[in-house]
Curated annotation (Swiss-Prot):
GO biological processes: glutathione biosynthetic process
Pfam families per record: Glu_cys_ligase (PF04262)
Functional pathway: Sulfur metabolism; glutathione biosynthesis; glutathione from L-cysteine and L-glutamate: step 1/2
Keywords on record: ATP-binding, Glutathione biosynthesis, Ligase, Nucleotide-binding
GO molecular function: ATP binding; glutamate-cysteine ligase activity; metal ion binding
Keyword Isomerase assigned: no
Catalytic activity line of the entry: L-cysteine + L-glutamate + ATP = gamma-L-glutamyl-L-cysteine + ADP + phosphate + H(+)
EC number: 6.3.2.2
InterPro entries per the UniProt record, alphabetical: Gln_synth/guanido_kin_cat_dom, Glu_cys_ligase, Glut_cys_ligase
Name under which the protein is recorded: Glutamate--cysteine ligase
Gene3D superfamilies from the UniProt entry: 3.30.590.20
Amino acid sequence: MSELLNRRLSLLGANLPLLKQCLHGIERECLRVTDEGRLAQTPHPEALGSALTNEQITTDYSESLLEFITPALADPAKVLESLEETHRFVYSKLGDEYLWSPSMPCTLPAEEDIPIAEYGSSNIGKLKHVYRKGLALRYGRTMQCIAGIHYNFSLPEALWPLLREAEGSTENDRDYQSSAYIALIRNFRRYSWLLMYLFGASPALDKGFLRGRPHQLEELDAETLFLPYATSLRMSDLGYQSNAQAGLTPCYNNLASYTDSLRKAVGTPYPPYVEIGTHVDGEWVQLNTNILQIENEYYSNIRPKRVTYTGERPIQALTSRGVQYVEVRCLDINPFLPVGIDLTEARFLDAFLLFCALEDSPQLDNGECGQCTSNFLTVVKEGRRPGLELHRNGQPISLKDWASELIGRIRQLANLLDQAQGSDEHAKALDAQQAKVDDTSLTPSAQVLARMTEHDESFVQFSLRQSRVHAETFREQPLSNEKQQAFETLARESLARQSELEQNEVGDFDLFVGAYQASILAISS
């Protein structure tokens, strides 16, 4: 254990109540499917409100890809309760459709028949739609149908000044906090392979997903492709490469270098996109011809975040007010869990992220950056391979040894969290993960393959069965009238807000896009 972590643990031990002020939020994406396990071609249900203005129920890429968003709360149990209630409400409005249980998609229609999400006729609604048309053009619609869990986490705001003072930092509070979150992200890059081993749940996929493209996967049956030791094919390259983003590798050495690299990417034309242009036959097909249309197009496993004001762009918020929380984006949906994640996973994530934040986090040089990427990709493709070795400081080390050692180091944070909350829940969550390290058959990825083999099911058959099991769970536990009414009010109010936006819209869409592009160039370095 580093001396820095020791000192920080002592400081936390003397300020235990602070640890009850960490905030958590979850975003869960999931496809709407028919009772045959095919993509639902119906519009976003009006009974769920406006996908543009409902803050709890929206759509991601496709009209058929729902996204549920919880509030940020201090108690992860309450966050999961909120997510569960959203699922129960949605099921009361879904008719004979289902929410798809895993991350990898159901049987998809032809590429051009995957519906892109619609957000109405306001300028901001049209901007969101054109952005998604650009994603289709650049990466294909099929790729955009993969779903995941995003876990948002922040440390208590009151902790940063204490740490800054104890360490005699010359940075102001805001910059110290941003530097600390970027340090968390560097450690996350070092250790996130562990999350893929423990929580990866996508070792197989529907054959049609690859659209006949060449791949290195094996056949499990006539309809299913897999890799025998894979943990998360969702997070592997799957033969897709974004050449445009290939040169975009911010190694998170400070906030300024991160925002600068993103600002350059949203302002630098990419020749193949320039060749297509922003319009085809007079219709918008992408917002611009730059490497990234907007910041959120940058694909990463974790993002530094700051809540934005209306009309503000993510880079503007980060540059002016610093980092407020991190968004973990590499978590698979666990198809065995009704909402795709449970409290045990959340408790482990809290201890893991706290460890990443407080452990010493030197700058990443190119060699270590490459090693982090390589370890991550090795684990997603063959994390359960017996005797698998990763690389640490350029030296080989067995995954099992390193995982056990890491869990041992994270345990100190789990113990502090338990002391703060007067429980042993975090320690138990760590025990459950250590058991998976000791026995690979306990990992979700192994369990998925075991169930499919046991029931002689294809990926789609297994997934549909799980989706039906969860649907029954939710439908058997309807919300109280009061809760149901609250969701229905949210939905109605969101539709009214969208309608108001559309009625009060002034200004031409082309000018709106121009102003939106210009806003990024106005940010000074």
